[in-house]
Amino acid sequence: MTEQIPTIEYNTENTERADGKKLARVHSIESFGSVDGPGIRFIVFLKGCTMRCQYCHNPDTWDTHSDQLMTADELLAKAIRFKSYWGANGGITVSGGESLLQMDFLIEFFRKAKAQGVHTCLDTSAQPFRRTGVFFEKFEELMQYT
């Protein structure tokens, strides 16, 4: 008999402000990381993951609810304060949880980071990845800025 894996609903409430700006559910921020991409990184850990891996490094990020909601502008302003530490190879890494669950935010955030010449990295298991439909269209857009 095969065990059924439960479906986990992703909480999509409060992901956009009244003015249309996307909000990220942020778990935590590391301002000086050296293992999550090239050079010195500003690392953003987003909330939400449906995989529940037994040996997950960040199980506290699984839950999608967060008291820390931030716009791309707010998060980028916080990151840019540390830009002088990044050197030529550093930048911003977004991790999680599963970062692709907040795709709309990522597109906006990485687009704004690239406009300021910031190197970006995405840490993902790609679990929600689909090579069809709206997801793939958004993923292709995100890759332009990653």
What spans do the regions from the language model cover?
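Conserved Radical SAM active-site core
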Residues: 24, 40, 58-141
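N-terminal [4Fe-4S]-dependent radical SAM core
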Residues: 1-45, 52-66, 81-88
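Non-cysteine beta-strand/loop elements that form the S-adenosyl-L-methionine
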Residues: 143-146
